[in-house]
Amino acid sequence: LDCTVIDGNLKQIDAGSGSVVGVNNLNETFVLIDNVFTKISGSLKHFSVGPAGQLGVNTANNIFKYQSGGFVQLAGLLKQVDAGGDQIIAGVNMYDDIYCLNMDANNKWPSSNTPWVQINGKLKYYSCGPYSCWGVNSNDQIFIMKDVSSNVCSGSGSFINIPGLLSMIEVATDGSVFGVNSQGNLYQRTGVTRSKPDGTDWISMVACPNGHKHVSFDLGVLWLVCVDGSIRKCILTD
């Protein structure tokens, strides 16, 4: 990995659709503007950006979508939300229940109802890409949901366990999958394609000298939050 340090300190980062966002330990929200993490108004504990828009949740688990210059609340409660799917929203609540919102409902919003779809299972973290969603449960076991589309955000409806243990996982808009385990090690899933969305193996890589906390990938750039909160921007090298 070819990495550079970006000024700032974050606990969570997300890159998608050409944007990069994050939050710090004070739940202040940041957007990358001209390679500088710039504070914007609003308090969030998790912030996600992607084809579904800019979405976040606060410490009370309220859900917000950034719309015309400010955050507007969506109906429902989630502790973590993801905007990386094909205009679908996905996330998990405080009980590790899993929900998603189809493209039509997301794009029609704000409307009188927000028809969240519950997905069978329990996950503490859930992230979607163009054709699959990946998640981890409270035991750090890894699961994939296949056949996810903009109109069927729940996919096939049944999770498949993938060998390995991760504490967080992110699927990029191009389908790439990266994750971090509880020891702070960084992994990429190899062999991921539309026809084989679960890929083949985990390979480890190092971007942070003292361990990794959070990872996201977009447009060929890997964005890392290290254990100490410092930020790395890395280019994948063969």
From Swiss-Prot:
UniProt xrefs under Pfam families: Tectonin
GO CC annotations on file: extracellular region
Family of this protein: Belongs to the tectonin family.
Intrachain S-S bonds: 3-234, 100-153, 128-133, 208-226
Tissue: Expressed in the eggs.
Stretch list, region 5 X approximate tandem repeats: 1-199
UniProt keyword annotations, A-Z: Disulfide bond, Glycoprotein, Lectin, Repeat, Secreted
Name of the protein: Fish-egg lectin
Compartment(s): Secreted
Phylogenetic placement of the source organism: Eukaryota, Metazoa, Chordata, Craniata, Vertebrata
InterPro entries named among the record's database cross-references: Beta-propeller_rpt_TECPR, Tectonin_beta-propeller
Sequence repeats: 1-34, 35-68, 69-106, 107-156, 157-199
Glycosylation sites: 27
GO MF annotation, one: carbohydrate binding
Summary of the function given for this chain in its UniProt record: Lipopolysaccharide-binding protein with a very low agglutinating activity for human A-type erythrocytes and interacts with both Gram-positive and Gram-negative bacteria.
